[in-house]
UniProtKB/Swiss-Prot annotation:
Pathway: Amino-acid biosynthesis; L-isoleucine biosynthesis; L-isoleucine from 2-oxobutanoate: step 1/4; Amino-acid biosynthesis; L-valine biosynthesis; L-valine from pyruvate: step 1/4. It comes from Saccharomyces cerevisiae (strain ATCC 204508 / S288c). SUPFAM superfamilies: ACT-like (SSF55021). It comes from the Eukaryota. Residues 1-24 form a transit peptide. Present with 15800 molecules/cell in log phase SD medium. Regulatory subunit of mitochondrial acetolactate synthase, which catalyzes the first of a series of common steps in the biosynthesis of the branched-chain amino acids. Stimulates activity of the acetolactate synthase catalytic subunit ILV2 seven- to tenfold and confers sensitivity to inhibition by valine and activation by ATP. This is Acetolactate synthase small subunit, mitochondrial. The acetolactate synthase complex contains the catalytic regulatory subunit ILV2 and the regulatory small subunit ILV6. GO terms for biological process: branched-chain amino acid biosynthetic process; isoleucine biosynthetic process; L-valine biosynthetic process.
Length: 309
């Protein structure tokens, strides 16, 4: 009887010690105990693999085979509209992200909005669709950026602003100014000085015309520039003795055409802003409205769930 009690007590002690070991093995120091127990244990040798011995022909063939084919997708203009926080350093972070990917920004306009602490950033760049989409997502992951909208395939209204100072004395006087600037910035340019003297000796040069004839030419040039500017929707904002300043707000292609047309008069100075863009508001036709109504009815009432008959 006493022996059986001792045996049962021994089993209970062993069971409790095993349970204690199990509980200890799952504690936070189990990893430390494992490292202490296996500190002096010899580690098994690492497996060795014999690398194949290649020659130059095999290596070149493998490199050519593994090199991906260049993308044949054409590069096109992309318009990105970024909604960002109005705080210092946002512009540098966005432009740095694009520069890291090798993009050349064609146009960049940043301005405040009607909402406090919110700015709008319009970026125009050239690139492939996939690469630009990756850059757009990377910019959108920046902390001060709310969202980046891609207006590339959307119907948008584009506008740029240009101010140009145009000569009223004609192309000859403009060429005289260019040559004079060339001689003043390059020492010892004897050929340019000879060209200046040759142009000034011509009969049609403003310096050789009577004052009344020069006045008539200036008014004719001003009238032509004013009519051309009005046809493009711009206006003359300043007139001086030898030049005038015109202002025009239009889409980029129209501004480029205007500058090309006033180039013969002599563009002395030009300041052109970047492109601003806003999406057009879609207008639905009667057919699209009927299709939307049918779709709403089909979503509300599922014909397959109706009872037969």
């Amino acid at each position: 009887m006493l022996r059986s009690l001792l045996q049962s007590g021994h089993r209970r002690v062993v069971a409790s010690s095993c349970a204690t070991m199990v509980r200890c093995s799952s504690s936070s120091t189990s990893a430390l105990a494992y490292k202490q127990m296996h500190r002096h244990a010899t580690r098994p040798p690492l497996p060795t693999l014999d690398t194949p011995s290649w020659n130059a022909n095999s290596a070149v063939s493998s490199i050519i085979y593994e090199t991906p084919a260049p993308s044949r997708q054409p590069r096109k203009q992309h318009v990105l509209n970024c909604l960002v926080q109005n705080e210092p350093g946002v512009l540098s972070r966005v432009s740095g992200t694009l520069a890291a990917r090798g993009f050349n920004i064609d146009s960049l306009v940043v301005c405040n909005t009607e909402v406090k602490d919110l700015s709008r950033m319009t970026i125009v760049l050239q690139g492939q669709d996939g690469v630009v989409e990756q850059a757009r997502r990377q910019i959108e992951d920046l902390v001060p950026v709310y969202a980046v909208l891609d207006y590339t395939n959307s119907e948008i209204i584009k506008r740029e602003l240009v101010m140009a100072r145009i000569s009223l004395l004609g192309t000859e006087y403009f060429e005289d100014l260019l040559l004079h600037h060339h001689t003043s910035t390059n020492a010892g340019a004897a050929d340019s000085q000879e060209l200046v003297a040759e142009i000034r000796e011509k009969q049609f040069h403003p310096a050789n015309l009577p004052a009344s004839e020069v006045l008539r030419l200036k008014h004719e040039h001003l009238n032509d520039i004013t009519n051309l500017t009005n046809n493009f929707g711009g206006r003359v904002v300043d007139i001086s003795e030898t030049s005038c300043i015109v202002e025009l707000s239009a889409k980029p292609t129209r501004i480029s055409a205007f500058l090309k047309l006033v180039e013969p008069f002599g563009v002395l100075e030009c300041a052109r802003s970047g492109m601003m863009a806003l999406p057009r508001t879609p207008l639905k036709t009667s057919t699209e409205e009927a299709a939307d109504e049918d779709e709403k009815i089909s979503e509300i009432v599922d014909i397959s769930q109706l009872p037969p008959g």
